[in-house]
């Protein structure tokens, strides 16, 4: 894992070099932004244990620096936010780190590249759909470093038609021994082709190499084919076939997943959007014990006068080998979630999120179910132009067939923050 730390430092240096070289080469609009946040955090069950709970209060201070640069054909973004965290339980301090860097450039009328790196050193689990990270809440508090790198190149060879080459790399490295560290490599290729104004298609392939410390290493091949038809400017229908093959380097049983679906993407009104996809997934194990699952996706978004409401429901098969928890593998699951964001007053914004998810794990010796309920609520008040005060509450209840995996956790956050532009040139 020491080599990965060197690569992270090298990646950050490359980004800074690209930023300053690009800024000097052409006329760019640059902004330096600074901020700071003060926080109090209460956690009722830091180790996500159903017995012998440990509670903790922490106090944190986190300065931040953001550097933005934009030009006619390229954009740079760099943000770094270290955090000094004091634990009232252990009377110790730690320093967290969060870094995000992006560089995209249009080299010609047809060629564009993207380079992005995200680094995080912390204890809390977190999810980020944009970079494809989901470290499960059930991990509890474990000190770790996580780095995610993405590089891609697109070539537009015709109207609404392109070829995309990509490479993604993720590294999870825990400070304590015995955790499921991993290195994940994923090169990929995607083709989007517009046949005519009504018909278009997408085909993609990705190979994933997973190198784990505690679990079996794996090789994964994943391919998808989509066919789209535009019924109208506001309505699109499509069909999809997907295939995934996983080969383990160890006693874990290899498997294939076949998925066939059809769907609808429609703007019901200027403020309402509906996405619907349904079909079936088939889980085929080399050692027998095949299973099938309903594949379903529903998303409804409604723009309110002063807010946004979203509702989603989904079911299918979920591959969780890279969740930072051992003995996860493939689960058959279903989930519902509702989110409401509302501007309550001129300077007061509220948020409420509720979700329920149920998993049946198919690769464990005895199939086990886990049921998770989550709620997340916050109020944010803006004042004095640059300042914001936020109070947030989260609750997680995990009810598992295996009693040792059951727990509930309450968290309360109080955050005072400010951010403003310091310099423009």
Language-model regions, residue ranges each:
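Gram-negative and organellar
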Residues: 27-425
């Amino acid at each position: 894992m020491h080599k990965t730390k060197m690569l992270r430092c090298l990646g950050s240096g490359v980004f800074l070099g690209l930023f300053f070289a690009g800024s000097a080469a052409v006329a760019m609009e640059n902004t330096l932004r600074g901020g700071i946040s003060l926080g109090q955090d209460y956690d009722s069950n830091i180790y996500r244990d159903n017995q012998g709970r440990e509670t903790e209060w922490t106090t944190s201070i986190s300065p931040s620096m953001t550097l933005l640069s934009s030009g006619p054909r390229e954009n740079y973004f760099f943000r770094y936010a270290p955090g000094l965290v004091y634990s009232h339980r252990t009377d110790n301090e730690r320093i967290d780190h969060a870094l995000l860097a992006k560089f995209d450039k249009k080299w010609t009328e047809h060629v564009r590249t993207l380079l992005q790196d995200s680094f995080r050193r912390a204890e809390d689990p977190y999810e980020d759909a944009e970079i494809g990270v989901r470290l499960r809440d059930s991990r509890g508090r474990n000190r770790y470093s996580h780095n995610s790198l993405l590089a891609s190149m697109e070539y537009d060879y015709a109207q609404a038609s392109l070829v995309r080459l990509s490479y993604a790399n993720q590294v999870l490295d825990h400070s304590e021994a015995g955790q499921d560290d991993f290195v994940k490599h994923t090169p990929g290729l995607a083709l989007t082709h517009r046949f005519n104004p009504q018909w278009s298609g997408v085909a993609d392939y990705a190979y994933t190499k997973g190198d784990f410390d505690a679990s079996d290493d794996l090789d994964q091949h994943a391919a998808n084919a989509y066919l789209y038809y535009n019924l109208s400017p506001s309505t699109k229908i499509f069909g999809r076939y997907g295939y995934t093959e996983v080969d383990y380097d160890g006693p874990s049983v290899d498997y294939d997943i076949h998925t066939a679906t059809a769907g609808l993407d429609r703007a019901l009104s200027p403020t309402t959007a509906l996405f619907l996809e349904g079909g079936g997934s088939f889980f085929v194990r080399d050692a027998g014990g095949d299973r099938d699952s309903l594949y379903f996706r529903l998303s409804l978004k409604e723009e309110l006068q002063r807010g946004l409401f979203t509702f989603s429901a989904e079911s299918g098969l979920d591959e969780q080998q890279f969740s930072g928890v051992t003995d996860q593998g493939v689960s058959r699951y279903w989930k519902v979630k509702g989110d409401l964001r509302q501007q309550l007053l001129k300077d007061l914004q509220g948020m409420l999120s509720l979700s329920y998810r149920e998993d049946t794990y198919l690769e464990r010796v005895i199939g086990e179910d886990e049921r998770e309920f989550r709620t997340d609520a916050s109020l944010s008040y803006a004042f004095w132009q640059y300042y914001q005060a936020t109070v947030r509450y989260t609750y997680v209840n995990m009810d598992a067939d295996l009693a040792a995996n059951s727990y509930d956790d309450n968290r309360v956050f109080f955050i005072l923050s400010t951010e403003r532009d310091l310099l423009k040139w």
